[in-house]
């Protein structure tokens, strides 16, 4: 039986070749922070990290996660709030909240990659926009979301 590590725990993967990663995350493991919205990989609400890389879990076969490390929104921050999560709270960067988990996972990965490669420099609006280009917010909370992400960088807090 194949396994993956999800949020630090080793979990079995189903043998069903039709099973998607989102199904395992939400239905089998009851990690319901990850949302299924479009089912076509265009909204970003189902974003998780696979070996540190953001992927849309609604398109990824569960079997493709075998031997890999998966992080859901519940695992971001490793037991404490990530700088992005703190900034989202400070800026009230959500409305209905359905897109928020995907934005947080993507933004946290972007934050950590940026810090690792560019140190304390703050990304431009264009850099932030490019990092979030695969995410949709039906409520239009983009101004607050981008402000929160920018603050996560300006605060100088990494974790």
Tell me what each language-model feature is.
Residues 1-159:
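Signature of N-terminal electron-transfer/Fe-S-associated modules in redox systems
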């Amino acid at each position: 039986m194949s396994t993956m590590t999800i949020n630090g725990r080793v979990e079995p993967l189903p043998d069903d070749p039709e099973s998607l990663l989102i199904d395992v995350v939400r239905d089998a493991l009851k990690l319901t922070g990850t949302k299924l919205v479009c089912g076509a990989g265009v909204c970003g609400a189902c974003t998780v990290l696979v070996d540190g890389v953001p992927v849309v879990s609604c398109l990824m076969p569960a079997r493709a996660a075998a031997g890999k490390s998966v992080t859901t929104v519940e695992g971001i921050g490793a037991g404490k709030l990530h700088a992005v999560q703190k900034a989202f709270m400070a800026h009230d960067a959500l409305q209905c909240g359905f897109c928020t988990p995907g934005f947080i996972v993507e933004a946290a990965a972007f934050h950590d990659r940026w810090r690792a490669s560019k140190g304390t420099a703050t990304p431009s609006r264009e850099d932030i926009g490019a990092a979030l280009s695969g995410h949709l917010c039906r409520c239009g909370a983009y101004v607050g979301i981008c402000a929160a992400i920018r603050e996560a960088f300006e605060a100088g807090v990494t974790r």
